[in-house]
Amino acid sequence: MAIITIARELASLGEETAQELSQISGYKLIDKEYLEGKLNSIGITAEKRQKYDERNPGFWASLSQQRDDYLHFLKTAILDAAQENNCIIMGRGGYVILRGVPHMLSVKITAPLSVRVERTKRTFGCDNKRALQIIEQSDHDRGGFHKYFFSTDWTDGREYDLTINTGNTDPAHAAVAIDSLRKVFVDKVKEEAGVQKIEDLVLAQNVVTEIIYARKIPVHFLEATVERGSVVLHGVANAQSSIDTALAATHSLSGVKHAESAIQLVQEFTVMP
């Protein structure tokens, strides 16, 4: 039992590799269509997603509430999928959202630029110049997406357990390589620890959803950390009543064994002229 995340460059055959991997491993493929369906079901429409989905958001988009909503519910959708285990999560920063999960195997699919250009020319029926423009825009958008949402450099090979260059291999053989590593990478100890970690991450996400989105309690920059059902709330509030209400909301959730606050209380003040 494992979770595989795949980050891929445009024209690196990442999607094709993931499909092959799903077939030989029996793992469920969590792709763009799956995640879009999840986000649609909770009100993150295509119109809202188009500003952020594996894109480099503009200045105003990066400051909007829609950005926070998109990121929160993207995490929710990915964690819900990961909780089922035995899945392959395509893109969307899955390897960052699940960072630290012991039975998660992170993979990057890449290819030489010259190969990517030829593949892009075939796909779009364009010349070299246009193909290069398409690739550069995609790389810029995906790099910006990871930087703005996760403060990470997705081109850094240290972010991944395995990087595969498909310049000289096909998706079928790339998938076999990933599956072979998966079989030796994930043992019983990692599996058990990973399942527990996912449970903690899901509960932390549920806590934030309950406080911010369900009850709309005014706690700013709210984060929840969870370890085996013990929850610590972090953030900023300007009233003790907000902190108390947030703690009560946390205690009401199934799976919470203990909850405490590390929320900073900052009293409002007025600057006099």
Where does each model-flagged region fall?
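Extreme N-terminal starter segment of soluble prokaryotic enzymes
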Residues: 1-3
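N-terminal targeting leaders
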Residues: 100, 111-114, 118-122, 138, ...
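ATP-dependent small-molecule kinase phosphotransfer cores
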Residues: 35-86, 126
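Glycine-rich phosphate-binding P-loop
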Residues: 5-19
